[in-house]
Amino acid sequence: MPRTTPAPGHPARGARTALRTTRRRAATLVVGATVVLPAQAATTLKEAADGAGRDFGFALDPNRLSEAQYKAIADSEFNLVVAENAMKWDATEPSQNSFSFGAGDRVASYAADTGKELYGHTLVWHSQLPDWAKNLNGSAFESAMVNHVTKVADHFEGKVASWDVVNEAFADGDGPPQDSAFQQKLGNGYIETAFRAARAADPTAKLCINDYNVEGINAKSNSLYDLVKDFKARGVPLDCVGFQSHLIVGQVPGDFRQNLQRFADLGVDVRITELDIRMRTPSDATKLATQAADYKKVVQACMQVTRCQGVTVWGITDKYSWVPDVFPGEGAALVWDASYAKKPAYAAVMEAFGASPTPTPTTPTPTPTTPTPTPTSGPAGCQVLWGVNQWNTGFTANVTVKNTSSAPVDGWTLTFSFPSGQQVTQAWSSTVTQSGSAVTVRNAPWNGSIPAGGTAQFGFNGSHTGTNAAPTAFSLNGTPCTVG
């Protein structure tokens, strides 16, 4: 519950608000006084972000701070930190009304000790929900949710500047509500209930809703947009929207900035909250260059929207990235590689913030004794980029077809076969038919023309039985495509 006086170790609410806005006010005032250091003087991404008046954050596992290279980068390159797992429900309330804040407090202490803004993640999420909570129903479940939100937000009051109050409320495809325990037991109203409880517990923290696959303008982001618009119209306390941005190399939505702007126009802040850009491994110079360009696009999209607060990457090093465990054969998604070497994305982010990186001598990576595998080959004409988000026995595929020939394609059919018995259950921006493992995808009425060098995109939901290997061969209008 709200306190009338701050508890020991908590600054007064007004003091916390002033501290939270210091960086952006300082950036504005210093520029106004014309004494700001030139952008070229930035030697770290933190300095570049500070100079741009934006956050640049990372997801922290406090157990890794004992690793010298990890801590050195964490200390110097970021001005915001978010707990990767330490503030989620299973970590903070493993049994009913028995709270455990040890790991979360370590993250909060680290933020305070290093002068970083602390971002809270997450109060209500259907994943990592303890079994005891899943077994509750009706009013008991709602009371447990409100109690959890209240106790956790109250504990970190004065330390957390912003909270992901509700995470991943919408499903993929047409953007219906996520079929979660919260939705099943409490219906649509649970989101509003959670936000009102969070505001009551901490009246000055910014309250955010956070989701994935909403970076472009699509059915899912439209559902999120409609909810935010409704909340703002009715005075529900929602201050910001987080765009997770777990992206795939070469597939940054072209309307990312426009999407951020339309949410900002509703009167909320926006931020990029969990950025990583994965590729098929092993990496190579071409993939890393494309990844760098993609990181730059994402940061530039934020920089072009006044109410975009900043960018957070979901980890520091590829060594500890979540990606390979969830997407076998993919990875290399972060700004530092598994040996803590800066990748080309580092300089790209620096430039997007408006600074120029300071060159640092590097030792060339030894040439591997085993040649890098060559991507699946085919005649110059088409390329397919295959991206998947998967869970238990389901998945969502997002597919980009690129016309690499010198002539336009007018009407297209893409064919491939599933290697592991997968089944398509729902498709969009296309017409999909399946016979056994063979899948045929035909264009929708609006995306049948692909100019030379242009792309068409479609997606579908599917089911699998535990193995979800990606197709290895595609043909467009009978011509084999490369896979990249």
Swiss-Prot record:
EC annotation? Answer: 3.2.1.91, 3.2.1.8
Q: Catalytic activity annotated for this protein? A: Hydrolysis of (1->4)-beta-D-glucosidic linkages in cellulose and cellotetraose, releasing cellobiose from the non-reducing ends of the chains; Endohydrolysis of (1->4)-beta-D-xylosidic linkages in xylans
Outcome, altering residue 168 to A/D/G: Reduced activity
Q: Where is this region: Disordered?
A: 357-377
Q: Give the organism the record lists.
A: Cellulomonas fimi
Keyword Disulfide bond assigned: yes
Task: Name the family the entry cites.
Answer: Belongs to the glycosyl hydrolase 10 (cellulase F) family.
Q: Where is the signal peptide?
A: 1-41
User: Which ranges carry the GH10 domain?
Assistant: 42-352
Q: Which SMART domains match?
A: CBD_II, Glyco_10
Which residues are responsible for catalysis? 168 (proton donor), 274 (nucleophile)
Ranges of residues in domain CBM2: 375-484
A GO biological-process term: xylan catabolic process
Q: Specify the protein name.
A: Exoglucanase/xylanase
In this record, what's one Pfam family? Glyco_hydro_10
Is Repeat given among the entry's keywords? Answer: yes
Query: Can you name one GO molecular function term for this protein?
Result: cellulose 1,4-beta-cellobiosidase activity
The alphabetized UniProt keywords are:
Carbohydrate metabolism, Cellulose degradation, Disulfide bond, Glycosidase, Hydrolase, Multifunctional enzyme, Polysaccharide degradation, Repeat, Signal, Xylan degradation
**Highest taxon of source:** Bacteria
Q: What else is known?
A: The linker region (also termed 'hinge') may be a potential site for proteolysis.
Task: Provide ranges: composition bias, Pro residues.
Answer: 358-376
